[in-house]
């Protein structure tokens, strides 16, 4: 099976009530470990590459590693995805270089500018059968050069307009998760009755409202590696219907432990 884009994968995930794992990769060991696990579990997977990984490992090497995984695990549907593409040029380079899915992260831009750059990427990507993930709202934290001191929640009233004007295939939203190993600074937290610092609460109400406004549409959650399992159950309860969950930090921690 050759590399695939995410469209059919997301459709199956939404109908089946499960989410696809998207794992950041930057070397042979991580690619091997993830794809072999997916082979055992008979699970589809998205292997994603950040801007930092492209700089560290070289675009061509990473593409060839993933192509090797496709060859070794032909029964596993694999998407090669750009994570947090910062601009049109980076997305275009990945599309031209063999990626089957890209994310354009215009979340820090003014709303209209985000629409403009996202639409430009979508129009180019769709010519080549490449799927596109957009983003509304920003996550706090630092991970692979994606840095925001303060996060901003997604505004549900914007999601329908954004999707209709850009033509994106999936949408990443911000409900209070955070990038990186060190999720929140003390001044971003509150203290409970025992004086223990507690991170900002996850905004399940936003997730619920977005799901109502975008029925049958793939919703993506970044910064999800530290979300407790009981919260995952709550996400489903509130109609999350998440089609994609991004995981980065645990794979790096596992590699060095």
Language-model features: where?
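Alpha/beta enzyme core
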Residues: 6-10, 28-48, 52, 61-73, ...
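Glycine/small-residue-rich hydrophobic helix-like segments
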Residues: 195, 205-244, 248
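N-terminal amphipathic alpha-helix/helix-capping segment at the start of soluble metabolic enzymes
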Residues: 1-21
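Acidic-and-aromatic substrate-binding clefts and catalytic sites of carbohydrate-active enzymes
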Residues: 55
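A glycine-rich helix N-cap at a beta->alpha junction
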Residues: 72-80
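Histidine-centered catalytic micro-motifs
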Residues: 21-27, 80-85, 218-231
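Single conserved hydrophobic/aromatic residue that forms the stacking wall/gate
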Residues: 245-257
